[in-house]
């Protein structure tokens, strides 16, 4: 059904799809297969069949299955504007962090992302490379974008000097709360918007208690000095 829909869309555009359209079709096919069968269970032949292109075309765009997997994750991050150049930078600290955290929670609560977390966790023990790829291409890439924002706020004197990598992981964990765990376990299908907004607001406020410049007597002598994974 999915393949037929893609072929119909290509026919409506007339003639053979262009290179970018083929790359997009390959990404969509790979995403569907990775979610259904995992990285280890998905072959490039299957991706080619699902996308309605030749295997040679798949390899022409993505040199390996690992490269294709990374591209799928990267495309999801970019969909939510979660790359360094896509994050807002001209707001005050609270407004900026609220905007960043809203995007972060929209990303990690996206059904496809939740499903991919489950796939990776299920395969991590038997195929640890899959977990490494996901961690590097997803959480670490997202962390890098947020670290740049936190570094800018610190350079502007709006946050105390800190290790931005460590602080980014802290901010993510404050955002997760118990919402993401419930999603992963299938205890909830979606998060009510008001609950999501409340969680984001609390996370930002708690983060600013730790890091906002000009807060007296809050015991920050050691805050942010531990080194986080890069």
Where does each model-flagged region fall?
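Basic, helix-initiating cap at the start of DNA-binding domains
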Residues: 1-37, 41-53, 60-61, 66-67
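Amphipathic alpha-helical packing segments from all-alpha helical-bundle domains
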Residues: 95, 106, 111, 115, ...
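Conserved hydrophobic residue
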Residues: 39-40, 130, 159
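Hydrophobic/aromatic residues within well-ordered alpha-helical segments
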Residues: 22, 65, 72, 76, ...
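C-terminal peripheral helix-coil segments that are non-catalytic and often amphipathic
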Residues: 1-11, 99, 103, 144, ...
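Amphipathic alpha-helical linker/stalk segments
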Residues: 70-101, 106-108, 112, 146, ...
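Membrane-interface starts of transmembrane alpha-helices
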Residues: 160, 164-168
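Short, structured helix-loop boundary elements
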Residues: 23-24, 44, 66, 70, ...
């Amino acid at each position: 059904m999915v393949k037929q829909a893609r072929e119909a869309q290509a026919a409506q555009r007339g003639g053979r799809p262009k290179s970018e359209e083929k790359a997009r079709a390959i990404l969509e096919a790979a995403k569907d297969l990775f979610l259904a069968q995992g990285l280890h269970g998905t072959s490039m032949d299957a991706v080619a069949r699902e996308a309605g292109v030749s295997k040679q075309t798949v390899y022409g765009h993505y040199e390996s299955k690992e490269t294709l997997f990374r591209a799928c994750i990267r495309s999801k991050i970019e969909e939510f504007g979660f790359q360094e150049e896509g994050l807002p930078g001209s707001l005050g600290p609270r407004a900026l962090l609220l905007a960043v955290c809203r995007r972060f929670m929209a990303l990690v609560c996206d059904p496809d992302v939740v499903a991919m977390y489950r796939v990776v966790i299920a395969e991590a023990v038997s195929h640890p490379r899959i977990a490494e790829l996901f961690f590097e291409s997803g959480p670490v890439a997202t962390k890098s974008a947020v670290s740049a924002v936190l570094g800018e706020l610190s350079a502007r004197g709006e946050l105390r000097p800190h290790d931005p990598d460590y602080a980014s992981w802290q901010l993510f964990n404050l955002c997760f709360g118990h919402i993401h765990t419930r999603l992963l376990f299938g205890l909830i299908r979606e998060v009510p918007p008001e609950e999501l907004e409340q969680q984001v607001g609390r996370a930002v406020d708690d983060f600013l208690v730790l890091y906002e410049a000009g807060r007296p007597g809050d015991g920050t002598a050691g805050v942010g000095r531990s080194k986080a994974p890069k």
